[in-house]
Amino acid sequence: MKQKTSLFARLADGSLVLQILVGIVAGVILATVSKSGAESVAFLGELFVGALKAIAPILVFILVAASIANQKKNAKTNMRPIVILYLFGTFSAAVTAVLMSFLFPTTLALSLDAAQASPPEGIGEVIHTLLFQLVDNPVNAVLTGNYIGILAWGVGLGLALHHATDSTKQVFADVSHGVSQMVRFIIRLAPIGIFGLVSATFATTGFTAIAGYMHLLLVLLAAMAIMALIINPAIVYFKIRRNPYPLVFTCLRESGVTAFFTRSSAANIPVNMALCEKLKLHEDTYSVSIPLGATINMGGAAITITILTLAAANTMGIQVDLLTAILLSVVAGVSACGASGVAGGSLLLIPLACSLFGISNDVAMQVVAVGFIIGVIQDSAETGLNSSTDVIFTAAACEAAERKENA
């Protein structure tokens, strides 16, 4: 029994990336060797997607309400330039993702029998739908997966509880922690679920499906590379008026590489703090901006949400006009700020963005499952971009403030 327990503990504490890779390889091998065997394990993928579908609405509602209710009062005003950079950078990432999706449209191999989309006519219908989703009954919003309504009621409850007693806030913080633990447990089952998903995908659609995933992954990585090597340096140059690349490459090397392998912005906070100290930044500033950046500076997440959502829209045959794409950029940017600290957080917020286009929760969750399949690389690159940008923008704001003082 002890041996079994230790084996389970080793599996639970092992590298999720390696386990997912094993699941993908095992699924491909099974589909190659035995098509019937691959089809028989498809239920593992369905169970995994079902668990995600069940927990996601509760997760969004509780996390949003708890984070707003427990927000610190009297935040330092000298954080404003950095916060503006964080938000602008996240929105820029979403816009970059929209442009990449328009230039290199992607479609996915999804099962569309279960639910069909009712595509919106344009921005007017999208806004009309959005307004009525906002005022949906909160219980119904959770039951039906109406993420716009969930987000609205979560924000409303969080604001209402912002002035509540500390004990009430602590209850919400504890519930939020509990839900996050449940999500982590479900994510630990990802290798088994992905094994079932990959087996079923290759058994039913053949190996042509991987071409779609490779195209999607290349578009995602290209958008993140453009953000890291072109957009971020341009933003930094605007602030510091000198060559930004020495700073950018230092941050990518010393923060981005570590974050790529840890796949956690929160886990990379100590690394970023040490880098800020090495860069001789103001401790009073970076001690606040780095943890804040791990929460709201989510350019990589905005790219993931936008590209996967537009891939879903393309797959469903929905024509996306420019104004709707801009609205998606805003929604993706705001949603990305809520992706922090949640395992697979950016993927679980895809249904919220998909709801803008009338895409059903069933189809959206299949897109989330595709995200988990490519997540071995996508999530690592996303975290590397997010975390390194925290230091880049903090350093740029500090240098700009110093230059202004010395002028």
Swiss-Prot record:
GO terms for biological process: serine transport; threonine transport. Coiled coil: none annotated. SUPFAM superfamilies: Proton glutamate symport protein (SSF118215). Signal peptide: none annotated. It is found in: Cell inner membrane. NCBIfam families: PRK13628.1. Belongs to the dicarboxylate/amino acid:cation symporter (DAACS) (TC 2.A.23) family. Involved in the import of serine and threonine into the cell, with the concomitant import of sodium (symport system). This is Serine/threonine transporter SstT. It comes from Shewanella halifaxensis (strain HAW-EB4).
